[in-house]
Amino acid sequence: MDTSQRIFITGVTGYLGSAIATRFVRAGYKVYGLTRNPERAADLTARGIHPVVGTLSNPGTFLPALKNCDAAIHVAFDPTDVVKQDQLALEAVRTGALDGRVRRLIYTSGAWVHGDTGGRVIDESAPLNPIDLVRWRAAHEDVAADLSEHEVKVIVLRPGIVYGGSRGLVGGMFAEAHELRALGYPGGSQYWGMIHRDDLAEAYLRALERGQGGERYLLADGSQLTARQVAEAIAEVTGVQARPRETSEVLKQLGLLGRALLTSQKLNPGRARRELGWTPKHTSFVRDAAELDQEWLATRGTAVA
């Protein structure tokens, strides 16, 4: 892959987008990152990212930059109006292909489009049964795939639950343990398909360089851990007690997100390993929990002992 090519990334200051952008910069690509906050521009520049200040709701703020890029990576997730924002992003990529030079798109979906898998291990061939939180996503995967009609090579990535650093769902569990000196977790027996965000960023790079257009890839570390095992590992390294929360409490507090966290999934990332040459370095959250706790402390700006 020609690393002089230009890559446009949405959500570049977000939990996933920041890690993905950093990995592409390290690989030598010219990265253009969309951010809503002009105050973040200097920080992005210092990290080797060309800041593009704008919003998905106003494509005119970023289309000139997008049209001049060779590939787009859509990672941004705005919970306030996620469906509309996602539609606008895909339409912008279409415009970038018709009127510009965009010829590749990596579209971020998620493993939750497969719904609850129970005790079964699934791969990409499993039927889609999206949970309510992401009910719209399966249709948007198809919209993204249709961009192939405009000579865009489209790859859809379906990550599981991402961990690492201080943000995200699992980062919130570390925060609860440290700040409240207690840890409640949803359910317990349900399986979570875990993936470290650095491994996820590597998968995006491999997908751009090696992925086949039209393919979908599940991304997880293959560890098949339950929510209880994740919570107990955090509790052990932070010195607190972990307790299961009643389902009614989880749903009342978190709504559709709570239902998502109660979803059980066993994911097989074999296709990504075979076709992308992707091998996650972090393969056991439980084994790495102490290191992950130190990573959480460091990224929160706390002195690490």
Give residue ranges: language-model regions:
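Mid/C-terminal beta-alpha module of Rossmann-like enzyme folds, strongest
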Residues: 203-257, 297, 302-305
